[in-house]
A protein has these predicted regions:
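Periplasmic peptidoglycan-binding/tethering modules of Gram-negative envelope proteins
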Residues: 1-51, 92, 110, 120-122
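Periplasmic OmpA-like peptidoglycan-binding domain that tethers envelope proteins to the cell wall
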Residues: 28-34, 57-122
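Conserved phosphate/oxyanion-binding catalytic-loop motifs
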Residues: 54
């Protein structure tokens, strides 16, 4: 009798891939974000079955909750459109959701004007 070990396949976990910053009240990515987009695209090219999730936020110190939610949705739409239109990423590989200002990923208020890009498990 021969014993054959089967390799253990570890399931990939979701991880933060990137953060894309925005100016106050803007849905247009802040200046100098091209390298961030290029890194996201490079990851997606190297991992052809990979998918990402875009979580949009707005800072809590300004605007009403509903206004901030709509702004966060516009931010994720902006990032999604750039990835699709400029870089040719398939829409089916991108999930997007606006979270608004109900959750704040960073302690520094200004940093919460952001879309966080998460690589999803394959």
């Amino acid at each position: 009798d021969r014993i054959v070990e089967k390799p253990v396949v570890k399931k990939q976990e979701a991880f933060r891939l990137a953060s894309i910053s925005f100016a106050y009240a803007s849905a247009k990515p802040a200046k100098k974000q091209d390298i961030v987009f290029e890194n996201i695209v490079e990851y997606l090219k190297q991992n052809p079955s990979a998918r990402i999730r875009l979580d949009g936020y707005a800072d809590k110190a300004t605007g009403k909750a509903r206004t901030n939610l709509m702004l966060s949705i516009r931010r994720t739409d902006s990032v999604r459109n750039i990835l699709i239109e400029r870089y040719g990423i398939a829409p089916s590989r991108i999930e997007a959701q606006g979270i608004g200002s109900n959750a704040q990923p960073y302690e520094d208020n200004d940093l919460n004007r952001v879309v966080i890009v998460t690589a999803l498990p394959e």
